[in-house]
Amino acid sequence: MSSLWIAIAAVSAIALVSGLILGFAARRFQVEADPIVERIDALLPQSQCGQCGYPGCRPYAEAVANGEKINRCAPGGEAVMRNIAALLAVDPQPLEGDGVQSEPQRQVALIDEANCIGCTKCIQSCPVDAIVGATRALHTVISDQCTGCGLCLPPCPTSCIQLVPVPTTTATWKWNLQTIPVHILEVERHV
């Protein structure tokens, strides 16, 4: 029984010394992050879609801090580009594309449920948890949460997911309520 206690004490001592060495090394060799990268990253929509050409919002924020174009974030659109321009004190640029400033047409993922095998690979790859389902069960996309990033397309083994444009209807139209005059009508109440 005493050899058991000796082994426990030896392993505990090794763990304690290793922890102290790692703690010292972490403080000694700590790399300070660039605060401008943190601020740019906070402005980005965090959809991790990769439409800017970078694997996520953080790498794109680092690239913008190093001089990359500020107009590549499609999900953020013009509002994010203008906020980044104000932060960096540079002129706003037209959104990436045909040189014309336009809002990209919103797309959402659509799953062909007849071909879905329920592998959950699309659920694991969705950065905003817009796909719901269970193993070996049908999956579906919550279109209000889907950013249209397309990260769910490559892992699908049956290619049953496609991006479809969202038609502009009264339900999907971006209403600017500040331009609509609102008048409050008095209503008589009968008791």
Curated annotation (Swiss-Prot):
This is Ion-translocating oxidoreductase complex subunit B. Residues 32-90 form the 4Fe-4S domain. It comes from Edwardsiella ictaluri (strain 93-146). One of its GO terms (biological process) is electron transport chain. The gene is rnfB. It is found in: Cell inner membrane. Part of a membrane-bound complex that couples electron transfer with translocation of ions across the membrane. Keywords: 4Fe-4S, Cell inner membrane, Cell membrane, Electron transport, Iron, Iron-sulfur, Membrane, Metal-binding, Repeat, Translocase, Transport. [4Fe-4S] cluster 1 binds at C49, C52, C57, C73. GO terms for molecular function: 4 iron, 4 sulfur cluster binding; electron transfer activity; metal ion binding. Binds 3 [4Fe-4S] clusters. Residues 1-26 are annotated as: Hydrophobic. Its cofactor is [4Fe-4S] cluster. HAMAP family: RsxB_RnfB. Residues 107-136, 137-166 form the 4Fe-4S ferredoxin-type domain.
